Amino acid sequence: MELGLTGKLLVAAPALAETFFERTVIYLCAHSEQDGAMGLIVNRRLSQPGLDDLFAQLGIEPSPPERRIGVCMGGPVEHARGFVLHSADWAGEGSLDVDGHTTLTASLDILREIAAGHGPRQAVMALGHAAWAPGQLEEEILRDSSWFIAPATDEIVFGTDHAKKWRQALVAIDFDPLLLSSSVGEA
């Protein structure tokens, strides 16, 4: 069953409590029945390494007016690999247009542009990503009720208040987070 989730948000449901994905919001960069899915967690900010640390490791010299973007734990796969999810107003070599509004770039060009104060209007960097085999995500959504699907908004994807993104995504689909529970009890 093709759900067409590219460019949407996966919002962790209570079924994922006490797992790696608890209270995560994932922007789906790619999803197809044949290839599975790939996405980036956009609400788990990393304190280390910070953007300056990454610039130093990569030999990129920032020059004023350097842009500040958040660095998130993108997911449990390929932690050493960096991805920049950004507005579609910038594209470089290897950039992938996700949905006409958002672009994914995994090359150093974008970091050099950001360090120089240029590049896309909005961006978030992720180290690592989340991935699902063909059919796996559909099963987690339809059978396991592990994820809610929400529209991606710039405020949630690129916003800097990472602690509020999960709640914002639930509110966007008319769920009251206070009413959610990971278990059902008896009266």
UniProtKB/Swiss-Prot annotation:
It holds the Pfam family DUF179. GO terms for cellular component: cytosol. InterPro entries: AlgH-like. Belongs to the UPF0301 (AlgH) family. It comes from Gluconobacter oxydans (strain 621H). This is UPF0301 protein GOX1459. HAMAP family: UPF0301.
